[in-house]
Every structure is written in structure tokens, then in C-alpha cells.
Amino acid sequence: MGCRDVHAATVLSFLCGIASVAGLFAGTLLPNWRKLRLITFNRNEKNLTIYTGLWVKCARYDGSSDCLMYDRTWYLSVDQLDLRVLQFALPLSIVIAMGALLLCLIGMCNTAFNSSVPNIKLAKCLVNSAGCHLVAGLLFFLAGTVSLSPSIWAIFYNSHLNRKFEPVFTFDYAVFVTIASSGGLFMTALLLFVWYCACKSLSSPFWQPLYSHAPGMHTYSQPYSSRSRLSAIEIDIPVVSHST
């Protein structure tokens, strides 16, 4: 498998990266990070559940799909440390992952549409597809770490809240969506690393174009006769001898 070809591994990693970024978007916007369930013993009243997200908060009665209270300014007054950290970490992870997707796309497009012989005028602008995929893999790994760590911490912080107050806090499915998306980012990075390691025997340097040697004036010179480069000593001059 050569680095000059677009393989299923790079295409699959790109699609996996898109799905993971979409999952991070969903996890960031979902108002289902933590539930606070308030149980009443009055038969004339219903139990109340408060759904807490990173940006909004919603309170519902049991059996109702409408929010009794919908706080759109919750993100300004978040009083839970793990959610405050997630407000910063998840958008940062999305930005890093989108940059990795852009690098991955540049590498694939350069591999698919670039000619085998580069233009001498564009020699300084040539891109190493393998280098793009390697850096993209590192960025995907970084994005997964940035999003996974605070998401797991939110689970343990939930236990801290139950010990500090009452056992009424539970984490909701947005935590699982984010953890699964972070796992997808790690899988994307792994696919790109495997692809790079499979073709690392290529002799091109890390960030040089994917050719056996860097293109230059001596490599792509205008065609002319090879004998014109020979010196007078190297040119074979026929000698005519007269027999006596």
C-alpha cells in the first residue's frame, strides 16, 4: 500500500471523523447532561425532574414532554464545575477536530487529483499527503483527549454531588453521546496512524512532496540532446587514416 493512493483506510477515517464531530455537536447542545429528580409524597402533586445541560436547563413534570421552566441563560450562571469545564472543552475539541478534518481532506484531494509529475512553478507549494494524514491523526487524538477527560470527570462529579447534598443527581445520555464521539475520534486517529505506518518506508521526508526526491530545476529541466552536455574530450571524433 503506497502513500500516493487514496485507500479505504483514509476514506473511512474521514467519514468516522465527520460522524464523531457531529456527535460532539449533539452532545454539546443536548440539555441532558444531568438530571435532578425531586420526589413528592403528596398524591395531588407530580414528581419534578430538572434536566441540566451545558447551556440550558429544563424542568418537567413526570409524564409531560413540555418544559415547565426553560432557562435559556443557564450557561451564564452554571454553578457546577464539571459543566463549566465542559463548556470550554467540548467547543475546543470540535474546533481541533474540524481542523484535523480539513487537513485530512487536503491530503486526500492532493493524492487523488495531483499529477504524478509536479509543475516546477508550484514546487514550493506541493503538499505531502502522508504528512497531512499524520498531523490530522495527532489532532484527532488531541481532540478526543480534550473531550473525553471532562466527560468522564462529569460521571465522578455526579457522585460527589450526591455525597455533598442528597442522592438525587444522575447523569443523562448526553454523557454517553460525548464519550462515544470521543472514542470515534480515537478510532479515526488510529486508522490514520495505521495508514501512515503502512507506507512510512517511502523515502520522502516528513513534510516534502510524495516523490522519490524533491523536485527542482535539475530534476525537471527542459529536454535537450544529451551529447550537447559532453565536453570536447568525451565526444568521439572519427579518425580517417590513409593507407600508403
From Swiss-Prot:
Molecular function, one GO term: identical protein binding
Transmembrane spans: 11-31, 88-108, 136-156, 175-195
UniProt modified residues of type Phosphoserine: 228, 231
PROSITE patterns registered for this protein in UniProt: CLAUDIN
UniProt-listed GO biological process terms: calcium-independent cell-cell adhesion via plasma membrane cell-adhesion molecules
UniProt keywords, alphabetically: Cell junction, Cell membrane, Membrane, Phosphoprotein, Tight junction, Transmembrane, Transmembrane helix
Cytoplasmic side: 1-10, 109-135, 196-244
Membrane topology listed for this record: Multi-pass membrane protein
Stretches of the chain found on the membrane's Extracellular side: 32-87, 157-174
Self-association state and partner proteins as the record states: Interacts with OCLN.
Sequence similarity: Belongs to the claudin family.
Biological role stated in the UniProt entry: Plays a major role in tight junction-specific obliteration of the intercellular space, through calcium-independent cell-adhesion activity.
Protein name (record): Claudin-12
Organism of derivation: Mus musculus
Gene label: Cldn12
